């Protein structure tokens, strides 16, 4: 079997194609969740915590030079090291929302699966049948 035909057989297997489709859909879905978090959820959370953009929450690890606005991008451009916990919290929230949505999708998928009927119990071996007959005969 040639290298090309081996690769073709591998690439056209159902599992590989399904995985590729899942990765592509997952990447697109990740962008949707990013938009939900950044454009809908975080502005509300930021408003609750004082009207600032939540991703601009940080702690400067050195003194901010005079004249530099107190915004994450400006402070970083000024070369001040920062502990950007707001960005981290945004990413954690993004992950939690994505994980919750995937959980709901998997739960629905499992619900939609048809329950397979339980297989009929296998007939007991002949020895067991004979032993049961002997037992029943002795009980009489």
UniProtKB/Swiss-Prot annotation:
Disulfide bonds: none annotated. Its main location: membrane. PROSITE patterns: MSCL. SUPFAM superfamilies: Gated mechanosensitive channel (SSF81330). It is found in: Cell inner membrane. It is a multi-pass membrane protein. The keyword Oxidoreductase does not apply. It holds the Pfam family MscL. It comes from the Bacteria. Belongs to the MscL family. NCBIfam families: mscL (TIGR00220), PRK00567.1-4 (NF001843), PRK13952.1 (NF010557). Homopentamer. Channel that opens in response to stretch forces in the membrane lipid bilayer. May participate in the regulation of osmotic pressure changes within the cell. This is Large-conductance mechanosensitive channel. It comes from Anaeromyxobacter sp. (strain K). The lineage of its organism: Bacteria, Pseudomonadati, Myxococcota, Myxococcia, Myxococcales.
